UniProtKB/Swiss-Prot annotation:
Family (UniProt): Belongs to the PsiE family.
HAMAP family in the record: PsiE
Subcellular location field: Cell membrane
Classification via Pfam families: PsiE
Annotated GO biological process: cellular response to phosphate starvation
Protein's recorded name: Protein PsiE homolog
Alphabetical list of InterPro entries matching this protein: P_starv_induced_PsiE (IPR009315), P_starv_induced_PsiE-like (IPR020948)
Domain of life: Bacteria
Organism: Listeria monocytogenes serovar 1/2a (strain ATCC BAA-679 / EGD-e)
Lineage of the organism: Bacteria, Bacillati, Bacillota, Bacilli, Bacillales
Length: 137
């Protein structure tokens, strides 16, 4: 019986270590993509080719912010003692929907529905930031 208790106490620790190592690898990968995206934006600003439109540059900037938000989420996970704050997922959702609207705004109905989704996420963010639901220090 004691052996089973010892195994059941070791398994969560091993899983947490595995999760943390995987998140560290994902974080470094995202940093590499963030640097690549920053380099692309820098090249587009200072060495703007006439074939590159501002539409694609805006898309690159929003992709940069998505990478940035995911990196911030991973950093916050380690700072808040292995807990993902809900509001960071909401920020990522809002940014992703805005990027999608910019990329594909051909249908007015879908743009209106996506705008409503952003409004719902902002309301959820407001609720998540109330003192009753906020668990961060």
């Amino acid at each position: 019986m004691k052996r089973l208790e010892k195994i059941s106490s070791i398994v969560p620790i091993l899983l947490r270590i595995t999760l943390n190592l995987a998140l560290i690898m994902v974080g470094f990968t995202l940093v590499a993509f963030l640097i690549r995206e920053a380099f692309t934006i820098f090249n587009n600003i200072f060495f703007l080719d006439t074939d590159v439109s501002y539409y694609y540059m805006t898309q690159d900037i929003l992709t940069f912010f998505l990478y940035f938000e995911f990196i911030a989420l991973i950093v916050k996970y380690f700072e808040s003692h292995f807990h993902f704050p809900l509001r960071y997922f909401i920020y990522i959702g809002i940014t992703a929907i805005i990027r999608f609207i910019i990329v594909d705004h051909s249908s007015a109905t879908s743009t209106l529905i996506l705008s409503g989704a952003i409004l719902l996420l902002v309301a959820a963010l407001f609720l998540a930031n109330t003192k009753m639901l906020k668990r961060e220090g």
